[in-house]
Regions:
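Alpha-helical hairpin
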Residues: 4-7, 80
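Acidic helix N-cap motif at the loop->helix transition within catalytic regions
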Residues: 107
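Conserved catalytic-core motifs of GNAT/GCN5-like acyltransferases
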Residues: 98-100, 116-134
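Acetyl-CoA-dependent GNAT
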Residues: 2, 9-12, 16-68, 72-74, ...
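Conserved acetyl-CoA-binding loop-helix of GNAT-fold acetyltransferases
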Residues: 71, 77-90, 110, 114
Length: 142
């Protein structure tokens, strides 16, 4: 059974293990811990093990910005990122939700499109030669 919940400090090591798997180091440890402390980190679990996580904040022009959407490499293409996004569509503190990914990350672009996000713009010069594409969706009204 898959469930999505807010992360707690007890989850930090499992979350970091996934992040290290993906980026190769624990450079985001403090960022992730801070997100957990602010209740801005959610996890997707299946059979009591954490398969992915999402962090967000509301500092993007006052709107929710999904900053990290990370799924364990061996658990991808199974709907876990979509479960995290779906949770945010129901629980976002703001009506508008933004996120972004590199132009080279076609898999994440497909996830955004499959979840109803629209392309909203592009930022050059963050990663040399690999523009950042901004995506946007409006939270469904209750």
């Amino acid at each position: 059974l898959r469930n999505v919940t807010k992360a707690s400090n007890d989850n930090l090591d499992s979350i970091l293990h996934i992040d290290i798997d993906v980026i190769g180091d624990d450079s985001r440890r403090n960022y992730i811990k801070h997100a957990i402390d602010k209740e801005q980190c959610i996890i997707v679990k299946e059979d009591n093990s954490i398969l992915g996580f999402l962090t967000y904040d509301t500092n993007f022009f006052g709107y929710t910005f999904l900053s990290l959407i990370i799924v364990s490499p061996t658990k991808r293409r199974q709907g876990h990122a979509s479960s995290l996004i779906s949770y945010m569509l129901s629980n976002s503190p703001t009506q508008k939700i933004f996120s972004s990914t590199n132009e080279s990350n076609t898999n994440m672009q497909k996830v955004f499109k499959a979840n109803g996000f629209m392309r909203s713009g592009i930022i050059e010069n963050l990663d040399e030669g690999d523009p950042e594409i901004i995506f946007y969706i409006k939270k469904p009204r209750a």
